[in-house]
Amino acid sequence: MFLAPWPFSHLMLWFVTLGRQRGQHGLASFKLLWCLWLLVLMSLPLQVWAPPYKIGVVGPWTCDPLFSKALPEIAAQLATERINKDPALDLGHSLEYVIFNEDCQASRALSSFISHHQMASGFIGPANPGYCEAASLLGNSWDKGIFSWACVNYELDSKNSHPTFSRTLPSPIRVLLTVMKYFQWAHAGVISSDEDIWVHTAYRVASALRSRGLPVGVVLTTGQDSQSIQKALQQIRQADRIRIIIMCMHSTLIGGETQTHLLEWAHDLQMTDGTYVFVPYDTLLYSLPYKHTPYKVLRNNPKLREAYDAVLTITVESQEKTFYQAFEEAAARGEIPEKLESDQVSPLFGTIYNSIYFIAQAMNNAMKENGWASAASLVQHSRNVQFYGFNQLIRTDANGNGISEYVILDTNWKEWELHSTYTVDMETELLRFGETPIHFPGGRPPRADAQCWFADGRICQGGINPTFALMVCLALLIALLSINGFAYFIRHRINKIQLIKGPNRILLTLEDVTFINPHFGSKRGSHASVSFQITSEVQSGRSPRLSFSSGSLTPATCENSNIAIYEGDWVWLKKFPSGNFGDIKSVESSASDIFEMMKDLRHENINPLVGFFYDSGVFAIVTEFCSRRSLEDILMNQDVKLDWMFKSSLLLDLIKGMKYLHHREFAHGRLKSRNCVVDGRFVLKVTDYGFNDILETLRLSQEEPSAEELLWTAPELLRAPRGSRLRSFAGDVYSFAIIMQEVMVRGTPFCMMDLPAKEIIERIKKPPPVYRPVVPPEHAPPECLQLMKQCWAEAAEQRPTFDEIFNQFKTFNKGKKTNIIDSMLRMLEQYSSNLEDLIQERTEELEIEKQKTEKLLTQMLPPSVAESLKKGCTVEPEGFDLVTLYFSDIVGFTTISAMSEPIEVVDLLNDLYTLFDAIIGSHDVYKVETIGDAYMVASGLPKRNGMRHAAEIANMSLDILSSVGTFKMRHMPEVPVRIRIGLHSGPVVAGVVGLTMPRYCLFGDTVNTASRMESTGLPYRIHVSHSTVTILRTLGEGYEVELRGRTELKGKGTEETFWLVGKKGFTKPLPVPPPVGKDGQVGHGLQSVEIAAFQRRKQKSSW
């Protein structure tokens, strides 16, 4: 997952929205506020800009009560809060966490893990080794790190196969091996409780030990009942030479009842007398407290206390304080709820905390070095990490392997406290003796095994019977073959399913393809022959569609067109005869094998299969569209000059394509020149292969081919019964010979024979004499003519294979490679005289496009400003002593928006502003901007016009008000669109703001006042300030104004304002303003009567 700062555009979008909600402060205040916010945001640390890195903590927190005692949410909260406050960690991101409950069944746990992949940036877990490898592969696919404390799978040690996986603790197997090697205990037994997570753990532990060459005698599962425990212990006693018993279950010291019962029964069966040593596996995953920590379960159960004398507890070494002390200190600081007692919390709490800190340390290293962190780089930068965790020192070496220290704890049958005996140094993988020796029952450890078990590069037989070993190997081989066969079957089924539903699906529908006008679907035309453009139909409320500038205007459908667009590329559809195909499942089940085989065909000279179209009763093969049309089209086009080198290159492409098909045991059966297409690079590709196979599989009838269609068919196939779709490799060779004749003479098959096609077919079917085309010698080299005659031999067995054809064809150029480039260069020399005209034509087109671009730029910015920006010059702010500004907005726009669909609001504003834009074109004004329903126009800038600016704005306002009186919304025609207009004159400063999408903006108190004139105006009214009225009266052009009175303008106090109601000579009708209420005001929204009328019409339409 790539980590980068939060896009600034998101902040701008939020800020603009806030500005619109506070529009009453005016544009200048809005701009000032925007600048202040920009300065504040730019000063914020990177964590404010960047999205949080969310860590998913995965474990069986709800289905296993002992796992739930780890309090994962509190541990994750404590770690993330400390990390986010830690000044030494410069992560560039704030850390967050999310708790994912892992089902206790591995299969369901994997399913839930997959469903969580979009909810987190990285994962701590899983806790169940049963799906660790799958989770790691998924994490690699998602580019999300998997940091596990429980995965024991030895396959995960491969950094190449699992680049996004890392362990936050040393591998438990490495720790066990270090201890076993020191005491020379090679023969092990593994026993687990019957919970699924521990069953999978047991099998992974056994598999990992066996991968290191150690003999694991038994792998057993037991419940809490006495019968299953006794049976399991008896099996261990019967196994050969077991020294160490690894218990994969919850430790009895933290409440594991199964282990308690197991040790009690082992004591009763006298298995705790020193013959065996019992090692709890789960204590390898956390730091078990032992310093001054009595355990009640040992004190209250004498039998268990005696049995525990045979137990060696291996756990992560604590530092200055135990887990309980660290927990109580955090509670005292208020970081953890004080109501939680430390002895009620599982030490796994610290492991979860350390894992989150482990990710933070890796991210800190990655950000320091690269400035960003992906999942793989997080794992890479988890090397050489050292930090103090919850109460442990966490370390890794240069390879990323954990080297945190472990301690071996022991007790005797008299005590209920644990004491340290050995320190397991994982950096050197050696044991260091402590102050107290291990107290083994009977005074001595279990008997040591041969040293060879731990010697690298040596095979230790260990008393295994060679015959038994051979039988085991054979059994494993049979099992492996069975598994491979089953896996192949499953993979085959998955491939079939993916053909229909996966990202590689090949059954397409109308939702996947867009058909192009049928005028061009009648034959394989080139891209250049079709001119199409996207026509926007936003005003009509419809989605954009394709329209064509030439040819038929008949709408393109799957029934009348063979050309379509799929994923941005042009494709060609070869339709099958109409028939009853049934549903999509029936097509898939009967033809999926052929679909898969055709999909796998990949060669430069094979037109690749894109898929199969099946919709609306149409079934078709979908292949890539080749712009040079078919070989038949090229041969018939006399404008294309073909020398022999060019022809031989096309023939060689055909030979290589057919050679590939025949090597894949794929007979074409329909080979002809029109089934050979040529792409834009003049590479010939074979297409329409597999057509007959699908016809047979789907049992589709086919129309009797015409005599012209049979001219490429081999004689033996022509003589077959009617209706049969025979095809053969030799028949393809015959078809190739006919294509050679077409290429040599640039004519149709048998074009030199003055006979109808039907009679030619009859002569071919009934020799003697053998009837074949006659090709004059001057059309091709003699050896090519000879090859052609061999290929159309009457006896099929006498025809060469395409391997032989290929070998002969290579020798025809006397050692020279058939290079179509040389031929094309000669063609270019012939056409070089036309290049100057072509360049001139393109230059003129470029100039036209340049003019269009400049015109568009001048529509967005004033011409002088646009010219300065094009030259790369700085646009200095310009002051204007006196201009007139126009503001207007739609009354009740919020209500209209709430009652309308978003596209209807867009249509409304587009229709209204299009109307306004047409009006301002006849006045000397400049449109500044539109924001939502607000429309801003100025006169007197950027081009000064003396005192005319007030008259121009006043005339434009009257025209706009008159046009709005008759304007109707398309979706709400019964609701009137009322606007209110505000005018004000005064000085402003204009300048260009921003580098990306620069805007021409106005600044000054005049902008504020004009906005206040609009916001304090009334519907269907032109609210004019005193300064504007003074200018209008000075001009003396007969403007009619009415005194409104003194109006409260926010930030300006009370000022005298006026209504502009007309002008002498202005004859256009103006809408009648709504009546003024008793308080002298009218509503600034829609009337209830108008809303009710719209709702009644909407209800009727829904009926």
Swiss-Prot record:
Q: Which CDD domains match?
A: CHD, PBP1_sensory_GC_DEF-like
Q: Which residues lie on this side of the membrane: Extracellular?
A: 47-465
Cytoplasmic topology: which positions?
A: 491-1103
Where in or outside the cell?
Membrane; Photoreceptor outer segment membrane
Q: Which GO terms describe its biological process?
A: cGMP biosynthetic process; intracellular signal transduction; receptor guanylyl cyclase signaling pathway; visual perception
Q: How is its activity regulated?
A: Activated by GUCA1B when free calcium ions concentration is low, and inhibited by GUCA1B when free calcium ions concentration is high. Inhibited by RD3.
* Residues of the signal peptide: 1-46
Q: How does it sit in the membrane?
A: Single-pass type I membrane protein
Name the family: Belongs to the adenylyl cyclase class-4/guanylyl cyclase family.
PANTHER family for this protein: GUANYLYL CYCLASE, RETINAL GUANYLYL CYCLASE 2
Q: How does it assemble?
A: Homodimer. Interacts with RD3; promotes the exit of GUCY2F from the endoplasmic reticulum and its trafficking to the photoreceptor outer segments.
User: Which named protein is this?
Assistant: Retinal guanylyl cyclase 2
